[in-house]
């Protein structure tokens, strides 16, 4: 059973009210998404506990909007934000991203999302977990359309996706004229590929030319030097 909280160096993530708990791949994502001094506004789509927003708040001075459909998860994220050092820059919106898009004209320097995945797999029977894991409430095309409209002309979007869904995301991006590239291949160990991170932009000027490989654990099941370097600012015992 997962703990009801996860303690980081600068903040705590309470997670007893949310279906999806803090996991290693999300932590890697939050620690490796590029942010710069020009990243003033960030949108976190499907924030859950607020983990990604909190990690990006620690890494930047940006103002961050976090959208979450599930009311319990949104309340948990609100509490986690309030108890963090960056509560004045973190804002939860309890609605679907489709509804949020309808009621705002705001565009963002950076958009991040760990979207629903395993669309072809069987559902668990747990409604909250199914909503978090499956694409019932957020289709790939809808997500990409929202990203296209809400991303600044010079902005960047990064999506943490299942390795089985990459073709669908590429096709959806092409349909709305977004440039898309595989930014990162994430491995649990040297041979076990677990996730892709996609990079989307409206232009190709600042697209990364080489895909990064990120390996979490070595053959002896210890964290790699790469992992320790990136997560040291967050994990207590690194």
Swiss-Prot record:
GO MF terms, alphabetically ordered: nucleic acid binding; tRNA (adenine-N6)-methyltransferase activity
Record carries keyword Ribonucleoprotein: no
Top-level taxon in the UniProt lineage: Bacteria
Pfam family, any one: MTS
Main location: cytoplasm
A GO CC annotation given for this chain: cytoplasm
InterPro entries in the cross-refs: DNA_methylase_N6_adenine_CS, SAM-dependent_MTases_sf, Small_mtfrase_dom, tRNA_Adenine-N(6)_MTase, tRNA_adenine-N6_MeTrfase
Localization per Swiss-Prot or TrEMBL: Cytoplasm
GO BP terms: methylation; tRNA processing
Membrane-spanning ranges: none
Catalytic activity: adenosine(37) in tRNA1(Val) + S-adenosyl-L-methionine = N(6)-methyladenosine(37) in tRNA1(Val) + S-adenosyl-L-homocysteine + H(+)
The enzyme's E.C. designation: 2.1.1.223
Role this protein plays: Specifically methylates the adenine in position 37 of tRNA(1)(Val) (anticodon cmo5UAC).
Family classification: Belongs to the methyltransferase superfamily. tRNA (adenine-N(6)-)-methyltransferase family.
Protein name: tRNA1(Val) (adenine(37)-N6)-methyltransferase
Species name: Cytophaga hutchinsonii (strain ATCC 33406 / DSM 1761 / CIP 103989 / NBRC 15051 / NCIMB 9469 / D465)
